[in-house]
Design a protein with these regions (language model features):
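Terminal low-complexity tails and localization/encapsulation signals of metabolic enzymes
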Residues: 1-45, 78, 132-151
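Glycine-rich loop-to-alpha-helix module at the N-terminal edge of alpha/beta enzyme cores
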Residues: 43-130
Length: 151
């Protein structure tokens, strides 16, 4: 999405696919408009990925998991802490995008972001739950259960 989200925006961005760590243009002929329900302005176009693009993404995810599952818990936690910091740093922009995409008020969008941030904060501490635990109310009305088992 464009950073400004101005009402006079004339260029509609085609969203790229993230496959194997790279942003790639889709080869699809089918696109879905992301429309601001309040203004009917088309904000972006999202591709309906082709079968080969889906296969490539699945294959890349499978390869990535082979190393991710060997990543120490502390390193995983640092990645989640970085995500937490990025959400906090960019929360106003994320709220603006969410508001435009869903027609929510900024206050509603900020509330959604805060709720998501609560889940990310819980994920930051997931390493302490590796023995398997049930945690109640990690976010308003959200409980989590962790179970350590090989995949």
């Amino acid at each position: 999405m464009n950073a400004s989200l101005t009402p006079n925006e004339t260029t509609v961005q085609n969203v790229k696919l993230l496959i194997d760590g790279e942003w790639v243009e889709s080869q699809t002929t089918e696109w879905h408009d992301i429309v601001n329900p309040a203004t009917q302005q088309v904000l972006a176009k999202v591709p309906f990925a082709t079968a080969s693009e889906v296969d490539a993404a699945i294959s890349a995810a499978h390869r990535a998991f082979q190393t991710w599952k060997l990543t120490p818990i502390g390193a995983r936690m640092r990645i989640m802490l970085k995500l937490q910091a990025l959400i906090r740093e960019h929360s106003k922009r994320i709220a603006a995008v969410l508001s435009a995409e869903q027609g929510k008020t900024i206050a509603d969008a900020e509330g959604d972001i805060f709720r998501g941030l609560e889940v990310v904060e819980h994920a930051c501490s997931i390493g302490t739950l590796q023995m398997g635990e049930f945690a109640e109310n990690v976010a308003g009305g959200v409980d989590t259960y962790t179970l350590r088992q090989p995949i």
